[in-house]
């Protein structure tokens, strides 16, 4: 049975939470789709919403997650912690 994705989203369009090591993207239900850095390293490309049944396909370059890049966030992602600091200022 084919998988039905709500959408396909570029990794660069997702927010990154450095503390939790998780990428997020807004879900229409009000929660957020989530995928971890480890899932991406394992070539997993499905981000799930914990509050509903929707899933998205994350478009990314697996080479960015090869061994040796564990301490670096992919370039061009939005750092959620930085957004919170900027919003509070």
Swiss-Prot record:
The record ties this protein, via PROSITE patterns, to: DPH_MB
Q: Name one GO biological process term.
A: tRNA wobble base 5-methoxycarbonylmethyl-2-thiouridinylation
Tell me any Pfam family this protein matches.
Zn_ribbon_CSL
Indicate where this protein is primarily found.
cytoplasm
**UniProt free text on domains:** The DPH-type metal-binding (MB) domain can also bind zinc. However, iron is the physiological binding partner as zinc binding impairs the protein electron donor function.
InterPro entries membership: DPH3/4-like (IPR044248), DPH_MB_dom (IPR007872), DPH_MB_sf (IPR036671)
Q: What is this protein called?
A: Diphthamide biosynthesis protein 3
Write out the function statement from the record: Required for the first step of diphthamide biosynthesis, a post-translational modification of histidine which occurs in elongation factor 2. DPH1 and DPH2 transfer a 3-amino-3-carboxypropyl (ACP) group from S-adenosyl-L-methionine (SAM) to a histidine residue, the reaction is assisted by a reduction system comprising KTI11/DPH3 and a NADH-dependent reductase, predominantly CBR1. Acts as an electron donor to reduce the Fe-S cluster in DPH1-DPH2 keeping the [4Fe-4S] clusters in the active and reduced state.
Q: A cellular component term (GO) from this record?
A: cytoplasm
Q: Which GO terms describe its molecular function?
A: ferrous iron binding; iron chaperone activity; oxidoreductase activity
Protein family: Belongs to the DPH3 family.
**Which reaction is the catalytic activity of this chain?**
[3Fe-4S](1+)-[protein] + Fe(2+)-[Dph3] = [3Fe-4S](0)-[protein] + Fe(3+)-[Dph3]; 2 [3Fe-4S](0)-[protein] + 2 Fe(2+)-[Dph3] + NADH = 2 [4Fe-4S](1+)-[protein] + 2 [Dph3] + NAD(+) + H(+)
- Give UniProt keywords alphabetically: Cytoplasm, Iron, Metal-binding, Nucleus, Oxidoreductase
How does this chain assemble? Component of the 2-(3-amino-3-carboxypropyl)histidine synthase complex composed of DPH1, DPH2, DPH3 and a NADH-dependent reductase, predominantly CBR1.
Residues bound to Fe cation are: 27, 29, 49, 52
């Amino acid at each position: 049975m084919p998988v039905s994705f709500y959408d396909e989203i570029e990794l660069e369009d997702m927010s990154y939470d450095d503390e939790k090591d998780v990428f997020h993207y807004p879900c229409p239900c009000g929660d957020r789709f989530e995928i971890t850095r480890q899932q991406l390293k394992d070539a997993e490309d499905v981000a799930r919403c914990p509050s509903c049944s929707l899933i998205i396909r994350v478009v990314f370059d697996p080479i960015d997650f090869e061994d040796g890049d564990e301490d670096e966030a992919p370039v061009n992602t939005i750092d959620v912690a930085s957004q919170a600091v900027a919003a509070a200022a």
